């Protein structure tokens, strides 16, 4: 029987999560989708809490996870508070959850992000975080970057960089499950922008007075390039 993994993509819909140099809910989703795709390519069954921008309350995440009965679960988040680096939270009881957190941490360091460590947090009911406390399988919360630290946010300021985090999470999961994969640690190459697309980007950016960061957010969406080209024609 194939292994199963549940992936939570934190926040969504009206809940943007942390917002500064990056919008957390959007980055979480790109990372989670990349993690899903890498796992399914290696024969792992995956269920996600969301695969688009929609409401995703934590109690519903936990319910869906337990109904799926996976071998492992991760909840993909990004941080705020002015810190720097990746961190992962696992249960105060240790076990496979601790192993999963440590395996993911090792892979994240390989893509160039520093780590604040693998941690636990005690609450009045045991584990502080519901995703770790109330899920029935070993579960880990991944905090990729600090969105309010410009230098740290730059570690995940393009879709390719965000996808690299997702693949790193997937490799850590596969390590924990004992499933082999390509050991290459190369970061995904940034796609080249052709002359026509670049001209459209410049035209729309100048006409609308948009910042480079805003344009990048637009281009990172699934149909962003096509939309920019249509907007460029509209302002001619």
Language-model features: locations:
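Short, flexible active-site loop motifs that bind/organize anionic cofactors or intermediates
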Residues: 18, 51, 152, 205, ...
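Catalytic-core environment of secreted peptidases
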Residues: 3-20, 74
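Glycine- and acidic-residue-enriched helix-capping/strand-helix junction motifs
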Residues: 16-30
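Active-site-proximal helix/loop segments of hydrolytic enzymes
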Residues: 3-4, 26-188
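Short, solvent-exposed alpha-helical surface patches in non-cytosolic proteins
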Residues: 188-236
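Extreme N-terminus of proteins, especially the signal/transit-peptide cleavage junction
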Residues: 1-3, 194
């Amino acid at each position: 029987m194939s292994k199963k993994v549940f992936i939570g993509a934190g926040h969504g819909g009206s809940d943007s999560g942390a917002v500064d140099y990056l919008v957390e809910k959007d980055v979480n989703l790109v990372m989670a989708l990349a993690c899903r795709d890498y796992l399914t390519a290696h024969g792992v069954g995956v269920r996600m809490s969301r695969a688009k921008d929609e409401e995703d309350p934590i109690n519903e995440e936990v319910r869906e996870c337990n109904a799926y009965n996976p071998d492992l679960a991760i909840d993909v988040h990004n941080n705020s508070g002015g810190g720097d680096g990746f961190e992962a939270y696992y249960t105060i009881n240790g076990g496979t959850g601790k192993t999963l957190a440590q395996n993911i941490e090792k892979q994240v360091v390989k893509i160039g992000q520093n780590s604040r460590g693998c941690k636990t947090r005690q609450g009045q009911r045991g584990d502080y975080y519901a995703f770790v406390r109330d899920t029935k399988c070993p579960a880990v919360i991944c905090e990729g970057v600090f969105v309010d630290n410009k230098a740290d946010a730059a570690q995940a300021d393009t879709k390719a960089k965000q996808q690299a985090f997702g693949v790193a999470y997937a490799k850590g999961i596969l390590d924990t499950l004992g499933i082999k994969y390509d050991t290459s640690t190369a970061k995904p190459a940034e796609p080249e922008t052709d002359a026509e697309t670049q001209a459209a980007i410049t035209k729309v950016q100048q006409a609308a007075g948009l910042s480079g960061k805003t344009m990048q957010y637009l281009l990172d969406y699934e149909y962003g390039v096509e939309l920019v080209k249509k907007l460029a024609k509209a302002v001619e």
